[in-house]
Design a protein with these regions (language model features):
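The feature captures the beta-strand-to-loop junction immediately N-terminal to the Walker
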Residues: 34-36
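Conserved ABC ATPase signature
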Residues: 132-136, 140
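Helix-to-loop junction immediately C-terminal to a conserved catalytic motif
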Residues: 49
Length: 215
């Protein structure tokens, strides 16, 4: 797979946050994104995800050398972007990360539920699978969102500050999991943990309206 951004200009309400962005992401790449708050890091992720249409420029997705409309993507947003008042259980939130569609009637298939159960067990959240998300702590919610990002076995995993609110033990487990996923998928991660980014990212870019390739 590949993602190709060319001459991207993007922002909100006419205010530019990204200017002249050109970036290539290849299969099993690991791109670490750093930069100041408000510099456009999350805006760049939203362009990747198709959640924000750029003012100008193009974004192209490829699989096996051929252009496709989209890729299988797992996404972990910042918890502040999540409406925890929405009446869903932990299990439903995790299952919602499936890229394959739900059945028209009856919700998720048996196979989808089994996959959700498997990833919840792996991440260590099975004990509160039936709990409503509004009852979770910040650290618990971050684990749930991490599981949701992984459940579809994505080709591209996008993580926006995944280490927020998690304790040291889970952070170590999460980083180890990310390294394992990178053997099969490309990773794009925004993080303030420069040590991890510098140790494991194959590419490092700094975003502050424009992008600067650091490695």
């Amino acid at each position: 797979m590949a993602v190709i951004l060319r001459d991207i200009n993007a922002g909100y309400n006419g205010r530019m946050q990204l200017c002249d962005v050109n970036l290539d992401i290849a299969d099993r790449d690991f791109v670490g994104i750093v930069g100041p708050n408000g510099g456009g890091k999350t805006t760049l992720l939203r362009v990747f995800l198709g959640l924000l249409k750029p003012y100008s420029g193009t974004i192209e997705f490829q699989r096996d050398g051929h252009q496709v409309d989209s890729l299988s993507v797992g996404y972990l947003p910042q918890t502040r972007d999540i409406d925890t008042d929405f009446p869903m259980s932990v299990a439903d939130v995790v299952a919602s990360g499936m890229n394959s569609p739900r059945r028209l009637f009856g919700g998720y298939t048996k196979e989808q539920r089994e996959r959700a159960d498997q990833i919840m067990h792996t991440i260590g959240i099975s004990d509160f699978a039936r709990r409503p998300v509004k009852a979770l702590s910040g650290g618990e919610l971050q684990r749930v969102l991490f599981a949701r990002a992984l459940v579809s076995r994505p080709e591209l995993l996008i993580l926006d500050e995944p280490d927020n609110f998690v304790d040291d033990n889970f952070e170590s487990f999460m980083y180890d999991t990310i390294r394992k996923v990178n053997k099969e998928a490309a990773i794009v991660m925004v993080s303030h943990d420069r040590q991890f980014v510098e140790s494991y990212a194959k590419k490092i870019i700094e975003v502050n309206e424009r992008i600067k390739i650091l490695r």
